[in-house]
């Protein structure tokens, strides 16, 4: 029985030493960094940061566009209400008894003002959309460009031993960059 325990301990020691030697070899491979690969990964990191900031700006522009549309709609709704009240008052006092009894002049004026307000609201909403469409499309294009730059700038390795890249691993994703330097160590 002791003989089997001794053999098991020897095998365990051999496996542990082999793993330690392999770990040292992979660390020495990682220690010899290629400057071009490191610069590429730094470019990828910066591109990911810029891409994230651009996404935040895109969200703010979309939010601001929506808020401006709400404000424009509210202001124009208030203008329409005040205009209809003013037309009612003017139509009843100036138009005389016949116009106030029939109310045709005031109704026609009210319909005309409502149509003007609706037209101006549609024009202002279109103007707000047009004003924000170009910067928003430019921001989306810049965000896409930085994502493409981030994925192309850093050559991702296939394994944790550094094969295929200057760093052990470089994973460029939409949520950030993860650098794995050596086996099990993340920076």
Curated annotation (Swiss-Prot):
Subcellular location: Membrane
Signal peptide location: 1-18
Record's GO cellular component terms: membrane
InterPro entries: HAP
Alphabetical keyword list: Membrane, Signal
Pfam families recorded: HAP
Homology family: To HAP-S protein.
Protein name: Plasmodium-specific hydrophobic abundant protein
Organism: Physarum polycephalum
């Amino acid at each position: 029985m002791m003989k089997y325990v001794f053999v098991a301990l020897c095998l365990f020691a051999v496996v542990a030493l082999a793993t330690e030697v392999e770990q040292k070899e992979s660390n020495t491979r990682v220690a010899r960094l290629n400057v071009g690969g490191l610069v590429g990964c730094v470019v990828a990191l910066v591109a990911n940061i810029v891409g994230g900031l651009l996404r935040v700006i895109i969200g703010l522009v979309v939010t601001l566009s929506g808020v401006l549309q709400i404000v424009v709609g509210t202001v124009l709704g208030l203008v329409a209400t005040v205009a209809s009240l003013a037309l009612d008052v003017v139509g009843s006092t100036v138009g005389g008894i016949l116009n106030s009894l029939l109310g045709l002049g005031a109704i026609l004026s009210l319909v005309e003002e409502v149509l003007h307000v609706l037209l101006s609201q549609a024009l202002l909403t279109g103007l707000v959309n047009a004003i924000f469409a170009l910067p928003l499309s430019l921001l989306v294009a810049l965000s896409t460009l930085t994502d493409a730059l981030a994925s192309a700038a850093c050559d991702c390795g296939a394994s944790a031993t550094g094969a295929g890249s200057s760093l052990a691993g470089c994973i460029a994703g939409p949520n950030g960059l993860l650098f794995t330097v050596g086996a099990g160590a993340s920076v």
